[in-house]
Amino acid sequence: MNIDLNADLGEGCASDAALLQLVSSANIACGFHAGDAQTMLASVREALKNGVAIGAHPSFPDRENFGRTAMTLLPETVYAQTLYQIGALAAIARAEGGVMRHVKPHGMLYNQAAKDPQLADAIARAVHACDPSLILVGLAGSELIRAGEHYGLTTRQEVFADRGYQADGSLVPRTQPGALVEDEEHALAQTLGMVESGRVKSITGEWANVVAQTVCIHGDGEHALAFARRLRAAFEERSIRIMA
């Protein structure tokens, strides 16, 4: 069994360099919620140095709230903004002798696209227009995954080690209790269960089916690095190969 382990980078976290030694894919902020041209270049160089797959992490234009504010934008606006961000990172990767492999939306853009077919379509269309060989990463079972499949893109269904789930397989909103899994043992058991059995227990006690092709670990938590090391070791103990 194989699993991809991904982390968001270029968002101002001091742990980026250490995380790159543990993950197989990096989602690099493209300036709309965090980062700038210099951090994008630095992140690409670090990813290449560590043999980590490079991906774009486009967002709503919301630096003030780290891309976590809900927005109502026209699909064509989202298409243009997504194309702009992923095109910039693709150019930087190419200039450094690398290749951008995937796209994973950030924050509220990711969450809204999981449920909004028009928004999901705009993102998938932009990814396809930029490069139809790119992998589109989205929440397992979401509208974004369906939109990617509609455009013939390779999709990668994502689960989260440190997020609570609702009975329908969606994430608990960050504004609600249970959104974050702060107990390390719980997070480890939840992640292994999703990867090995394709199920996750919701905060209300029901079991939801999920497809786990990539696991997101966040680098901004208090014990993020220690947990990432534990999770990687647990995968290796079970002969689960970590690869993009």
Swiss-Prot record:
One of its GO terms (biological process) is carbohydrate metabolic process. It catalyses: 5-oxo-L-proline + ATP + 2 H2O = L-glutamate + ADP + phosphate + H(+). Keywords: ATP-binding, Hydrolase, Nucleotide-binding. It holds the Pfam family LamB_YcsF. Transmembrane segments: none annotated. Disulfide bonds: none annotated. InterPro entries: Glyco_hydro/deAcase_b/a-brl, LamB/YcsF/PxpA-like. One of its GO terms (molecular function) is 5-oxoprolinase (ATP-hydrolyzing) activity. Its EC number is 3.5.2.9. Signal peptide: none annotated. Forms a complex composed of PxpA, PxpB and PxpC. Belongs to the LamB/PxpA family. Catalyzes the cleavage of 5-oxoproline to form L-glutamate coupled to the hydrolysis of ATP to ADP and inorganic phosphate. This is 5-oxoprolinase subunit A. It comes from Citrobacter koseri (strain ATCC BAA-895 / CDC 4225-83 / SGSC4696). The lineage of its organism: Bacteria, Pseudomonadati, Pseudomonadota, Gammaproteobacteria, Enterobacterales. The gene is pxpA.
